[in-house]
Amino acid sequence: MAVQQNKSTRSKRGMRRSHHALRSVTISVDRTSGETHRRHCVTFDGFYRGRKMIEK
């Protein structure tokens, strides 16, 4: 089992965790339906970049 040789400081711990923060999701509005959706994802209606991608 790995055991640290010296105590890590609060500063080093914080620097290591600096990339752990959650980022907000970017939301776009579809040109055709006006529906909001995540970037680079198909809307619930099946539209992506103004075109029908999925037939229901």
Swiss-Prot record:
Composition bias, Basic residues: 9-22
GO terms for biological process, alphabetical: translation
Keywords carried by this UniProt record: Ribonucleoprotein, Ribosomal protein
GO cellular component labels: large ribosomal subunit
Single GO MF descriptor: structural constituent of ribosome
Keyword Ribonucleoprotein attributed: yes
InterPro entries: Ribosomal_bL32 (IPR002677), Ribosomal_bL32_bact (IPR044957), Ribosomal_zn-bd (IPR011332)
UniProt region (Disordered), positions on chain: 1-35
Coiled coil: none
PANTHER family: 50S RIBOSOMAL PROTEIN L32, LARGE RIBOSOMAL SUBUNIT PROTEIN BL32
HAMAP family xrefs: Ribosomal_bL32
UniProt similarity note: Belongs to the bacterial ribosomal protein bL32 family.
Protein name (database record): Large ribosomal subunit protein bL32
Organism whose genome encodes this protein: Blochmanniella pennsylvanica (strain BPEN)
